[in-house]
Amino acid sequence: MDKHIPVLLKESIEYLNIKPDGIYVDCTLGRAGHSSEILKKLNQKGFLYAIDQDQIAIDQAKEKLEQINNNFLLIQGNFSNLSALLAINHVFNVDGILYDLGVSSPQIDIASRGFSYKMDGPLDMRMDLNSTLTAHQVINTYSESQISEILFKYGEESFSKSISKKIVESRPINSTLELVEIIKSALPQKVLKQKKHPAKKTFQALRIYINNELIALENSLKQALDLLNSKARICVITFHSLEEKIVKNIFNNSTNYYQEQLLSNLPIKADLNSKFKLVIKKPIKPSLLELEQNHRSHSAKLWVIEKN
């Protein structure tokens, strides 16, 4: 089984509502699973811009996409700079934008990049190798309280205090598997017996912090809304509650959803004209078949907004 099957592929492409001559953006190129499907639906007038922080992902995706057609441009950069990355290419309005926030870029499988808690490698975790902050610096130089806060805030780790205490006691720590053993030693037996890997939350927290993922997502989504043509859509696939909260808040604030909920209980009619509408009231989850075939899809949710 390919563990990098694109999640919610059919649903996200369907809800993107692709026009053959439209301009589309894939903000998370990764292994080009979604980009490939978008490109297949475009004619010679249509065009795809795909963004990734990692040059390895871009180099590999280029070969794959060229087999479909050449109506695309791959951009190395952080999607938090979405407007600027497109403006450089004289693009100011688009017909659809896709985000797949799952970690599926090629670098995850390379032990030397330090993302995996299953393979030994240096404590790195940078998506963009041009950035400077690494997991090694955080683990070996941050205070116990700083590390605890990162694990709790970005990993929702209930045992953040005991893990951070063990980390500080065990310094210096140089490899991913060394860190995994330290995390395990800080956790009670009942947690170690659970199905989920005991280091998953800590590694998620470090990755999010080092790559500034949540702030990048918030900034990018706000820019994405401003880029939409009329009837254009944004589709976002989230994988954990921290991402969900950001998407939900931005989408609901943009559509007057909260105001409508408030006024629905009052005996007044208000004209709440909004520039955007939620295409689906509740996010779409994977089908039972997809859940069976692709373990990555278990926590995935698809959110869709449209400009009126």
UniProtKB/Swiss-Prot annotation:
S-adenosyl-L-methionine binds at A32, G33, H34, D52, F79, D100, Q107. It is found in: Cytoplasm. Keywords: Cytoplasm, Methyltransferase, rRNA processing, S-adenosyl-L-methionine, Transferase. Its EC number is 2.1.1.199. It catalyses: cytidine(1402) in 16S rRNA + S-adenosyl-L-methionine = N(4)-methylcytidine(1402) in 16S rRNA + S-adenosyl-L-homocysteine + H(+). It is an enzyme of class 2 (transferase). The keyword Transferase applies. It comes from the Bacteria. GO terms for molecular function: rRNA (cytosine-N4-)-methyltransferase activity. GO terms for biological process: rRNA base methylation. GO terms for cellular component: cytoplasm. Its main location: cytoplasm. PANTHER family: 12S RRNA N4-METHYLCYTIDINE METHYLTRANSFERASE (PTHR11265:SF0), S-ADENOSYL-METHYLTRANSFERASE MRAW (PTHR11265). Belongs to the methyltransferase superfamily. RsmH family. Specifically methylates the N4 position of cytidine in position 1402 (C1402) of 16S rRNA. This is Ribosomal RNA small subunit methyltransferase H. The lineage of its organism: Bacteria, Bacillati, Mycoplasmatota, Mollicutes, Mycoplasmataceae. The gene is rsmH.
